[in-house]
Design a protein with these regions (language model features):
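Short aromatic-glycine-(Arg/Gly/Cys) micro-motifs in beta-strand/loop hairpins
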Residues: 20-42
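A generic structural signal for alpha-helix starts
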Residues: 51-54, 103
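A short, exposed loop/beta-hairpin motif centered on an aromatic-Gly-Thr core
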Residues: 44-49
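Conserved NAD+-utilizing ADP-ribose enzyme module
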Residues: 1-16, 24-26, 42, 63-179
Length: 179
């Protein structure tokens, strides 16, 4: 495969999006190679932008498990870039969860769907401050993060752990993006 896009773009083209179901936000999937030491925005690859339920499902179901376990992926809301320096991220932080490799694929998919479907939390005020999710591979586990636009909302109890099986708040850490 020559590009990230070839790995994840839905295989079938749907003729018309007129009957599609709108999401409340537009989302972009970004990728970054874990061993790339360039952290400028140029090193991130914009994979796919979508704002319909059907496109979200097609994308999520197309991403190979090996890519989820071995590539840094960023699912970001609207025009938010996957960097701490983005104006909508710089005053924020993220919740970090350590996930064993055997659980990563399923947890990523559950988080993906709960994020774009606005069910990641029941608190609508809290939901407004969630900018995206990321995954970073390590040797035997991955770190999954939920990015927040500010540091006022540091309570992981607000995240719907019940619908994301395997994601626990025990051991969850919140870290500011920039000091």
């Amino acid at each position: 495969m020559n590009s990230y896009q070839e790995m994840v773009e839905p295989k079938e083209t749907i003729e018309s999006e007129t009957n599609f179901h709108n999401l409340s936000d537009k989302w972009t999937l970004w990728a970054h190679l874990p061993h790339d030491t360039d952290w400028s925005i140029n090193s991130y690859k914009n994979i796919y932008t979508f704002n319909h339920v059907e496109n979200a499902i097609a994308l999520c179901e197309t991403i190979p498990e090996i890519m989820i376990k071995n590539c840094m992926l960023f699912l970001m809301k609207g025009s938010i870039k996957p960097t701490w320096e983005d104006p909508q991220n710089k005053s924020g932080g993220s919740f970090s969860f350590k996930i064993l490799n055997k659980n990563v694929f399923e947890i990523w998919k559950q988080l993906f769907y709960s994020l774009v479907g606005n069910t990641i939390t029941n608190d609508k005020e809290y939901l407004k401050y969630i900018n995206g999710i990321t995954i970073s591979p390590k040797k035997n586990f991955c770190i999954i993060k939920i990015w927040m636009s500010n540091c006022k909302h540091q309570n992981p109890d607000k995240i719907n752990i019940d619908i994301i099986k395997g994601l626990g708040i025990q051991g969850c850490l919140f870290r500011k993006h920039l000091s």
